[in-house]
C-alpha cells in the first residue's frame, strides 16, 4: 500500500501535491483544511518557504528514537504519543539542532517520521535508539486526527454567504476577505480594489482611465479629436474636394 499517494492525492494515505481536499492522511500543499494528517507545505506545520531560524526553544521534550538510516536522512519512531508538525526542528537533549521533520508516516496511533539533517550532521553517526527531542509547542494531540463522536458538522446549510466561502464570506470565494475574488479585499476581476471592470484603477467601460466614450482619446467620438470635417487640426489633407 502506498503511503504517499500520487500527485492528485484524492483520499490517498498521504495525499500528494494536490491533496488536502480528499481526506488524505497527510494532506498536500493545500494545508490542513481537508482533514489531512500532516498538512503539507503551507499547512499547520508552518515552515516552508520564507521561514527563519528562531534559535533553540526554552524547553525540549522527547519525541522519538532513531530507527535506521535512509540515504542522507534518518527515520525515527515517534514515542511522544502526539503528532509533530511538519518541518519542525529536531534536537538532541542539549538543544543542538539535528535537522527538520520531512515526512510523517503510519497511523495516528502508531507512526514515525523522517528527518532531513542539518549541514554537518551525518546519518551514519546515529546509534540505535538514539533519543531525539522537539519543542513541545510543535506537537499536536492525536485526537485532532481521529473521527469526532458526532461525525463532525455536515456541509449542508451553508449556502452562499456561509462561514467558509459563499459570496460575501470572510474566508474566500467570491467577495472573500482574504482571497481577492470578485470584490475581494485584494482585488479581483470585477469590482476589485486593484482594477478590473469598474474597479479602482478603471477598466474597459466607464473606468477611471477612460474607455469607450472617454475624454482623452477613447474609441468613441470624444472632445479631444476633431472629426473629419475640414477643421484646423486636419490640414490640407482633411479638406473636402469640391466638384463642379
UniProtKB/Swiss-Prot annotation:
It is found in: Nucleus, Nucleolus. Pfam families: Gar1. The keyword Repeat applies. Residues 1-53, 145-244 are annotated as: Disordered. Residues 174-201, 208-217 have a biased composition (Gly residues). Required for ribosome biogenesis. Part of a complex which catalyzes pseudouridylation of rRNA. This involves the isomerization of uridine such that the ribose is subsequently attached to C5, instead of the normal N1. Pseudouridine ('psi') residues may serve to stabilize the conformation of rRNAs. Involved in phase separation into sub-nucleolar condensates. Essential for normal development and also plays a role in fertility. Component of the small nucleolar ribonucleoprotein particle containing H/ACA-type snoRNAs (H/ACA snoRNPs). This is Probable H/ACA ribonucleoprotein complex subunit 1-like protein. It comes from Caenorhabditis elegans. The gene is garr-1.
